[in-house]
Each structure stands twice: as structure tokens, then as C-alpha cells.
Amino acid sequence: MNLSNIIALNDYPQTPYQEETVINTLKFRWIHAQCYQFILPNGKCLLTDPFFPQEEKAWVRENTPFLDIEDLGKIDYITINHSHFDHVQSLPKIFKHSSPIVICDRIFARELSAAYGIQEFNIFPFVQGQQYHFEDFYLETYIGKHGNLKMVCDLNGNEFKDEYNPAIGKLNSYGSLFNTNFLFRLLTNFTIGFAAGVKLDNLKESWKYGGGPNLLLRQRMRKETPKEFAEECESIGGQLVLPMHHDACCKENEDMNLFCKNVNEIFISHQTPMRMFNPERLKWYTINLNISIEGE
């Protein structure tokens, strides 16, 4: 190398400096219950726990906006946390327009296929506690636990009986026994944590050394206070927090904007580098990674 050819950097070049650069990491919207729709960086679409607000047993008010099924677009992947009706009932509506991979626990995969007429070829049955590689993300599965409904297992499926479709009752009977949480690692290395139900010890243990996911979806229990929710999220770890299953409320926490504000105040008071965001139903949002110049 001829060192005489090296010149110093020109700090004031003719080409102006950039003031900002942005990478769109993820698009998402909340639909109902634990149903979120994600558009991944490569354009593929992931849907969690398909249950739309127009379903017969949905917790809705007179002014609750319903989803336009035509607006869903092509769904590539569906994940199912557990098999209660409010996590799977909208599957037939999706299969009228798409042919997604349905990722669910192998324990109830047969009943899911039978109850909703899903071809076995479309179902990817997993074993809890394992890792899986899909074309568009890596998936880690964690054993979860449903909240206590104080019920015993109904072998005949009478608790959720459907006179026109007997398989639905039996499918629902698995719902409180088999519950799975997830970590999605996108091809960009962005991570989405899905934490529903109770008894999250194995999930917390797995995530504690990595600081938790970039985006945490955490179930807001029906009677949960902002303090309880904030402290549970802190124990899980993560950066951005989105609520799920907050369609079911009690009078004290029906204002989710106030709930979110109170949770963030607790995060700030605890000096926790975590923030909660309450998405408006059906509205699209974008998570960006960006660099921007500080104001002078």
C-alpha cells in the first residue's frame, strides 16, 4: 500500500448528509381477542388465534367495528395458542380466500382438521418445547397454562356443543389443558414474543438472558390491574408491549387507553426500558428501526 495516496476525510462534501434513514421492521393490527395480523418484512402474512369480532359469541358492543374479510388479504401462516372456540372459530372464513399453514399442538390437530374442514396437508402439528424453521421465521414453542376455569375435562364435548358440528365440542375440551406460547424470530432477527395464560416460568427462564423479545404480546387478564400487568411484563422481559384478549374486561379496566397510560407510568417509575402501546382495533401500525439527527 502506498501511504502517500491516502487523503483525509472531507467532513463537508458536496453531497449533503442524510438526516434520517428508516427500515420498516413490521406491520401489525389487532383484530379481536388474541387475533393479531402481522405483515412480515418480506411481505408474508402471519395471523394469530383467528377469532373475529363478528363471531356469534364474541365480546362486542353495538359500536364495535367488524372485520371486512375481503380486507384480510392472503394469509400465509396461522398460529394457535389453544383450541377454545375464541381462538379458532374464524378459520373457515380464512380458508375461503387463503390456504395458510396452520401451526398448532399435535394433541388437537386431528380434531381441528375435522371440526373446521381443514385439509391435513395445511396443518403443521408441533411438539411443545421444540424449535422449528419455517421459510419466513424461526419458531420456538413453550408449554403454557390456561387460567383456571374450574371445569373438569368434558370427554363428550357437551360444554361447547354444536348440534351441527359435533367435532367442535371435542376440540374445545382440549382448550384448558394444552396451551402454547411462542417466540417468532424473523429473518431480520426481530423477535415477537407471544405470552398468554398463566404460569410462564419456563418462558421467563428461557428469555431472561436475552432481555426478552423486541415486541411482547401479553394477555391482559379480565380483572388485572395496571400494576399487576406491568410487573408481569417486567418479569417476562421485552421492549414494546401490546395487549391481547383485552376484549374481555371488567368495569375497572374497560378504558384500555387509561390502562396503558397507567402501565407506562409504572414502567417509568421503575426505570424499566419497556413501553406499552394500545392499538385501536383494525388500525394498521408500523414498527420502524430508524436513525435520525438530533435537533440543533
Indicate residue ranges for each PLM-predicted region.
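Pre-active-site segment of Zn-dependent metallo-hydrolases
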Residues: 12-20, 37-80, 89-96, 148-173, ...
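Beta-strand-turn-beta hairpins that frame and shape the catalytic cleft
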Residues: 21-27, 39-46, 131-140, 185-192, ...
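Short hydrophobic/aromatic beta-strand or adjacent loop that forms the aromatic wall/cage
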Residues: 33-35, 129, 177-181
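Active-site neighborhood of phospho(di)ester-bond hydrolases with catalytic His/Asp-centered motifs
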Residues: 47-50, 74-84, 103-106, 191-197, ...
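Active-site environment of divalent metal-dependent phosphoester hydrolases
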Residues: 54-55, 83-89, 109-112, 130-132, ...
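Active-site HxH/HxHxD metal-binding segment of metal-dependent hydrolases
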Residues: 65-133, 137-152
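Binuclear metal-ion centers of metallo-dependent hydrolases, dominated by the metallo-beta-lactamase
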Residues: 101, 114-134, 229-296
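Active-site-proximal loop/helix segments of hydrolase catalytic cores
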Residues: 167-236
